[in-house]
Each structure stands twice: as C-alpha cells, then as structure tokens.
Amino acid sequence: MLFGPESTGKTTLAKQLSVHFKTVWNPEFLRYYVDAREASKPDATKSEQITIAESELLNIAIGQLASEMAIQESNSDILFFDTCLHTNAIYAEHYYNNVPEGIERMLSSVNYDFFFLCNTDIEWEYDPQRESAAVRELLYDKMLTYLIDNNLPYSIVSGTGEERFNQVLSVLNSKFPSIVNK
C-alpha cells in the first residue's frame, strides 16, 4: 500500500513497481471521481480549487473499495495500491471532523499487508485537486500517527524517486522474499 498525503510520489511509485514486478496497480479512485464530476460541468462552473462535499465521502469510499476488490481478481502475487480506505478516513476526519459510519464499516473489511508512507521531502506540485504544501505536511503527520495508533506495519520512504523505489524494493525483499524473489 502506497500511503501518504497529496503530491508525495505515490502514483509514480505504484506505476514503477507494477512495471518492475510485471503486475497491476490500483489508482486512487478519488482522482477519477473528481475528474468525471468536473468534466460534466459547464466551463463557467469549473473551479480553480476542487472541493469534495461531505455528502460525497461515502460514494468515494465505495468506489475506492470496489476498485480495490476488482484488482484483487487479477490473482497476482503482489499488487500495489495508490492510496486506500484508510486515506479516505483520514481525509474525512481532517476536513469534516467525522468519519462516516459506512467508511468505518468498510475499513473493518480490508487488510493490507504493508504500508509505504511516502514522505513529503519532494517538491509539492500544484494540481486543482491538491490544497497546499502546508496541508500536505499536516496530513503526513496525521497519517504517521494513524499508522502507529492502529498498529499497522509500515516503512517511511523518502528521497528522490529512484531512492524511494530502491527503499521499497529493499523492504519488500526483506519482508516478502517468497513473493518478491519468484
């Protein structure tokens, strides 16, 4: 599981790892959801900064879970996920001080083998779906605390793209040698 706030290299890393291991990766559902929603709006109503209404949170989480379940049907030994339901919960708590009960229920049905928490030591890139570098830092701290509080297995990856890739490979080789070294 590639985990972390916005603009920390999760998507790039997921793509690189899926190519390296000749497997599939699951993109972040929220990005597709927002792109589709914004594409359906007339140009005059599109905004510079995209926001998500609290009423949309559950549908986004359902879409995230459905996409994760679909990719698991590939029967690959190793899969890479660019974000997950835990991220949905953290963002819901951050922006609305509330995690919808439906998301809490869905969280109890998922299990990820390992989390790679992507550090914020790479340059933040603007995107209408991203708020700011300052919020990225705040969310990174919340995500680290979440992993610790929930006793989830994780490793922090940092540095350049190549350094991050090599760190993930090293952890995978040590934690999952029977899968990685096939």
Feature names for model-found ranges:
Residues 95-161, 176:
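A glycine- and Lys/Arg-enriched "phosphate-lid" helix/loop adjacent to the NTP-binding pocket
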Residues 2:
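Hydrophobic anchor at the beta1->P-loop junction of P-loop NTPases
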